[in-house]
Structures are given as structure tokens and as C-alpha cells.
Amino acid sequence: LWSLEEPNLYRAVTALEADGKAVDRDSTTFGIRTVRFDADKGFFLNGKPVKIKGTCNHQDHAGVGAAIPDRIQAYRIERLKWMGCNGCRTSHNPPTPEFLDACDRLGMVVMDETRMMSSCPEGLSELERLIKRDRNHPSVVIWSLANEEPEQGNTRGARIVSTMKKLQRKLDPSRVVTT
């Protein structure tokens, strides 16, 4: 199983053939684990209670801005693990695939946050692409649909989030959401 201490990963290879010839091939890395949230008892990973000790990670780094090299992504997760962290939130922006790859390899749970709270076609398309891209990452345990949005906490915002949650549930019913 994939865990914080032993982040076991596997690779599935999918090949598409036509007339007996390989026409396409793709490889997907994944981990196997169970996740449960209990209102009274907290977070459980593989049936064991885990206290999430995390940080909010912004997509920027001194000297390189938002274009963080893969090695620095991994270095940041390694340092967080060394500090005793086991979780992080990708603040205000979706994470890069390389960031999630590092979290998968190093055993760090992630709250994967979308860029904006929106039920317009563009916003829902962005959310769909995010979920489809990131749903095989065992590190991702929560989808964050909104943060510091002007519509949070009012009737219009509730309608927007309801639409977003319906799409999230259709694409990935295995994870919880937060707004």
C-alpha cells in the first residue's frame, strides 16, 4: 500500500493496437491506499488515524518565480518531510504534475486546489482537466474547490460550488472536497 512512511508506487502500461500493430502506448504511475475522513475521529490512511501536519505551498520559489525546476519541487517536499510535515495544500493554484510526482514518491498527502470557484463552461472545463490529470496520484486526498472567493458564503456561491461538486463526484467519487 501507499503510505506516508512507505509510498509504494506501481506502473500500469496501456497499449492500443489496430490490426495487430501497436498504435499508441501510455504509462500511468499510481498507488493503492484507502482514505477516510470522520467528523469526530479525523483522517484515516489505510485504516490508521493520521494527524495531518501541513503547509500551504505557493507555486513560486526564490530566484525562479513560478517556473520551479523539478529538482526544486522534490527538494521542497524533502525539506517539509524533514521538518515533520506530512501534508500540503497547493494554495490558490493547481500543482504541477512534477510536484504531485514528488509527493507520491516521498509520501506527502495533498489538498489539490483549483484556480477559481466557477460554474461557467471555462471554469468547469478547467476543473475537469485538473481532476482527470491528478486523480491517479495517491498523494491527492482532498479536492479544494474554492479559497478566498468573493462568492463564498452566499447563495450564489453555494449554487456554484454545488455544480462544481456534482462534476467532481462524477469524475472522482473517491475523494472529499472542501470549499
Give the label of every model feature segment.
Residues L1-H92, P97-A102, L106-V110, S125-E126, ...:
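Secreted/periplasmic carbohydrate-active enzymes, especially glycoside hydrolases
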Residues N57-A62, M117, E148-E151:
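A short, flexible beta-alpha/helix-coil linker loop
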Residues A67, M117, T155:
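Charge-dense, low-complexity intrinsically disordered segments
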Residues R79, R129-R133, L167:
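A generic secondary-structure signal
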Residues E98-F99, S119, Q152-N154:
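Extracytoplasmic/secreted cell-surface and envelope-processing proteins
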Residues V109-M111, N147-E148:
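Active-site neighborhood of divalent metal-dependent phosphoester/pyrophosphate hydrolases
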Residues T114-C120:
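Short, acidic/turn-prone active-site loops that include or flank metal/cofactor-
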Residues L127-G157:
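Active-site groove signature of glycoside hydrolases
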